[in-house]
Curated annotation (Swiss-Prot):
GO terms for molecular function: 4 iron, 4 sulfur cluster binding; iron-sulfur cluster binding; metal ion binding. Residues 432-447 have a biased composition (Low complexity). [4Fe-4S] cluster 2 binds at residues 204, 259, 496, 500. Keywords: 4Fe-4S, Iron, Iron-sulfur, Metal-binding. The keyword Transmembrane does not apply. [4Fe-4S] cluster 1 binds at residues 20, 82, 85, 88. It comes from Candida albicans (strain SC5314 / ATCC MYA-2876) (Yeast). Belongs to the NARF family. This is Cytosolic Fe-S cluster assembly factor NAR1.
Amino acid sequence: MSALLSADDLNDFISPGVACIKPLASSSTNTTTTNTTDSYNENGEVEIQIDSQGNPLEISKIDDKQFQTNKLTPAQISLADCLACSGCITSAEEVLVAQHSHQELIKALQSQKETNKVFVVSISHQSRASLAMAYNVSIENMDKCLIDLFIRQMGFTYIVGTSLGRKLSLINEAKEIINRKTKGSGTGGIDSDSSSGPILSSICPGWVLYAEKTHPYIIPKMSTVKSPQQITGCLLKNLTSNSLNIEKSKIYHLSIMPCFDKKLESARPEVYEEEEEEEEEKDKALVSVPDVDCVITAKELITLLEECPQYQLIPPTLPQEELIGGGCLSMTEIYKQYAPPNWPFIEISWSNDSGSASGGYAYNYLTIYRNDLILKGYDGNKFTINLINGRNPDIYEMRLMYNGENKEKLASAAVVNGFRNIQNLVRKLKPNTGKSTNTTTTTTKSKVNPLAARRRARIANNRGKPETKSTSEVNSQEMEIVADASKVDYVEIMACPNGCINGGGQISAPNTTTTSITLPQKEIEKQWINAVLEKYNSIPMFDLSSQSSSSSSPNEIIKFIEWSKKFENQFNISDNRLFKTHFNPVEKNIIMSVDDPATALLVGSKW
């Protein structure tokens, strides 16, 4: 970890800096003029004074003569402002609460009669697992309870899982990496300089904001594929608009996510769509329509239920006949009944994917690439995926090997969780460093104590990493090699330790002060995360390309690709609009010096 940062600094739920660098637009309202003049000299002196009631006033003067007094209003900061500001590393608490919160959702529901909005909701896999763990019910029953809450009690029209958006994201992510790997050049916005290092995932908005604001040299290496949240939002709004024959601006999309930074992701300018809207005068005006209108977390949903007793997620008793479906409908029938009529692949619309609990991007890249090679004539029975552990449980590497005993590495991917590991990776990828061949060799094949390697293998096995080998099967030569994420084809990066299953918006473990449990709080939290992971893994699986069905899996992937092309043609949406995003370095607008006491006071102790 950098000596300039402390553990407190890495919190992804922080307040805006005292010296916010976003300029404020001045308002000419609430003005009083003591000396009138035909013209206002903007070059005059301006003072800020406090009146007798404590209100701030802006007083304009020229030659000591007072011309105009403006009553100042409180500064308003939007999510878009935060994205363009370099003052905070990730998100700002007050801004998130003000614009994406359960209170805003309640206000929107209360004003439904005036706005005529149609409400739809999408729910992430990790949030479902967190809620199921908190209420000690199965994933199936939690899904029924969520459908009951949003459809019957809160008046939502449709509810969907994020599985379709995730699978399309996984496929396009793998396509981008494979294209660069096979062609040897950048694709999808990745320039030629990125060919010397791995493609870095951009699914985690906390990591993306960190890169944009502190390490802009990393941006060319980042994947430009959108996250499941944003793809789902685009699909859901267009299909709902088509199904109900209404404008997309009349649709309010709520997304339930495991992370607070997902709120900022929904405010990125490239996820808005311009739509013509008829006004009362029959004139048409362009309005910006976001793919996601509001993002709340599982933790915030619990807060909403506590503040609004008219809503109940779990009935006092849980008889099957009182749940959605009445105990006689299958889950597929239930999902179909409450999704838009034109929602595709309904049987897998709430299903899970193999790999990490953050979506399995690294693992699915390897399996999709394996299927791509099978279609080119490779023997599917000769593939294996080997696990290489890192120096801590939050970093590991997977290698796609071929040809039995004479194994050849065809592809590799790594998973990196937590800011400590992210900082180490970013440091290795910094330009003009590590050019020495000897240094590279040493880094790639760093030796470690075999006992430590066995311990990491045991931890990985217990955590259920995909296709991991048992300790006895791990080759001794492999065990002496430490995972190096800077040398792989692709890196799945998540800001939170343990990934999205431990996102900042997930429901926390019970506190030792409020329970009779005598275990240390850290141990309780560890057990809680493992239990939530078990709930997550209990979600029915639908692999895009599992090895056991490698002959048919490519056809499944083709089905998703063909459907997405039909969707783009039907709604006149480009491939870039549906699947691609872009990133820009955030320029620092103020120059700070650690030797300047005044600057240090303005910035505060956080950064």
